[in-house]
Amino acid sequence: MSCMDDKKFTMTLLEFYDLFKNKLISRVDKNELDEFFFWLIDHYCNYSRMDYILNSSFKISKTQEQNLINSIDSLLNEMPIQYVVGETKFMNLVFKLNNSVLIPRPETEELVRWIINDAHTNKNILDIGTGSGCIAVSLSKYLNNCKVTGWDISEDIIKIASHNAYLNDVNVELELSDITKPKFLNYKYDVIVSNPPYITKNEKQFISKNVKFFEPHIALFVENEDPLCFYKKIFDFSNSNLKSNGFLYIEINENFSKEVIKLLKDKGFYDIKLKKDFRLKNRMIKAIKK
């Protein structure tokens, strides 16, 4: 390697790890710190955990070094790692992200698995508030012969979901639509799913800074006075646009499970099942339309 080439490669990954650890050790849990490190070197250097174990003295380019150092600054500012790298994994699929869409959560994976385990085939499925497309794309990927549609309220969000459908090689019909101003449809769905905003503004004080400062509030929070506002709209729409004996799946705020179930019963849904997430919190509901 020439002297000129040497100038392009100045830091080893081990040296970067030491810098990374020293900067962030007081801010990030040790186990999480290592996960973040390996996520970053895989993203920016295409260097896996095993590659690092076998050769931590690998020299990175100046561009890679700058990207990695910039990522430290972002993490120190409490930006979620998923926004730092611009992507995340969900249901073993890769989804591109920016801060116009929520970061998909493990609880939502549980909701998706519930739908998949119910083995819907040859169904028309609607995802209301699709965001990154994580629910719609995953259902299209893992269910047989289902037509999946995703709705959201802005072109920017639809573009992200569309890109994620393309990346994961699935066909999802993505449409601009606002459930608070539902449009008339002349057809009905077999399955409707939604993970709507459900955190009250009173609960905002308990939300971590990296969520509160970076994730889109419009996808997170509802007014204290009407915490079920989106559920009311979704249930009314589902009453008109779900087929008889069609399925409704929703993610919920654990503090309002009884109220959501009562609302479903009042709207005429039956066989209502409440399911806990991996943290043992009431998190998702399945119901059937009469």
Name each region found by the language model.
Residues 198-229:
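Mobile active-site "lid"/loop adjacent to the S-adenosyl-L-methionine
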Residues 3-68:
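A short N-terminal interaction module
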Residues 224-287:
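Conserved Class I SAM-dependent methyltransferase catalytic core
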Residues 94, 147, 171-173, 270-273:
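Conserved beta-strand segments of alpha/beta enzyme cores
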Residues 82, 199-202, 255:
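Active-site beta-alpha loop architecture of Rossmann-like, nucleotide-cofactor-dependent enzymes
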